[in-house]
Amino acid sequence: MQVFADIAVLREQIKQIKREGRRVAFVPTMGNLHEGHLTLVRKARELADVVVVSIFVNPMQFDRAEDLKNYPRTLEEDLSKLNGEGVDLVLTPTPETMYPQGLDKQTFVEVPGLSYMLEGASRPGHFRGVATIVTKLFNIVQPDVACFGEKDFQQLAVIRQMVEDLCMDIEIVGVATVRELDGLAMSSRNNLLTLDERQRAPVLARTMRWISSAIRGGRDDYPSIIEDAVDQLRAADLEPDEIFIRDARTLLPISSESKQAVILMSAFLGKVRLIDNQVLDLQTDTKASSEEE
């Protein structure tokens, strides 16, 4: 496994790989790797001859300085895990390398609409930061395919739209969320939970499954379902942040045309913000009754 901090040196390596006609898969990460990240790496290995991973805590996508400061950084452990998975190339740039003129003078990429709805409405600039860094990394790595986790559902939608809009010749593959045995979605932020918070954290996933069961059972009173879910979270001392039930393709409100719904949830446990989502098929009769209202 080769590790690069220098973009130009990595580019030369990628050029040689391309000249040899080998297919490149890319997994961008912010480090503090867990089984969810490694699942992305394994999927990438299935799809290409060469696997490239980046480790970069992107300051442009953080809306709170405290979150950026506290984000876990475990580079040596991360490199050991990637080496164990047979990763070929790893890019570990610094903020100064990625943003040599500083964030204020950085050209940015922004996906209209998707970037400022749902989570984007409460985190202005977040998805701009995501789209910008992913575009920069795509330009550096020049992958044929890139793998992203479905846990960050809106982020995946933003990236797919960006790739389509900018005519990037890159296949975007979404990989299912990996969960702990108690159902909690794996996340680097889970390491910041206290023991007591960690024991309560699975309530988020349980509440999400309850919402799914309610919809599958025929309920289409979505505002009322969300109110009930908020009560369930607060009963376990989780502070609800956002709960949405939307069309899984457009992220717009459910309509008679919707074939699938996505439940998007976030809640705070102490200072840690947890997120989760679930996609489910919609029954024809449920959609019809919802539209009639």
Curated annotation (Swiss-Prot):
(R)-pantoate binds at residues 61, 155. Keywords: ATP-binding, Cytoplasm, Ligase, Nucleotide-binding, Pantothenate biosynthesis. ATP binds at residues 30-37, 149-152, 178, 186-189. Belongs to the pantothenate synthetase family. Pfam families: Pantoate_ligase. This is Pantothenate synthetase. It comes from Vibrio cholerae serotype O1 (strain ATCC 39315 / El Tor Inaba N16961). GO terms for molecular function: ATP binding; pantoate-beta-alanine ligase activity. Catalyzes the condensation of pantoate with beta-alanine in an ATP-dependent reaction via a pantoyl-adenylate intermediate. GO terms for biological process: pantothenate biosynthetic process. The gene is panC. Pathway: Cofactor biosynthesis; (R)-pantothenate biosynthesis; (R)-pantothenate from (R)-pantoate and beta-alanine: step 1/1. The active site is at residue 37. Homodimer. Its EC number is 6.3.2.1. The keyword GTP-binding does not apply. GO terms for cellular component: cytosol. Beta-alanine binds at residue 61. It catalyses: (R)-pantoate + beta-alanine + ATP = (R)-pantothenate + AMP + diphosphate + H(+). The reaction proceeds by a bi uni uni bi ping pong mechanism. It is found in: Cytoplasm.
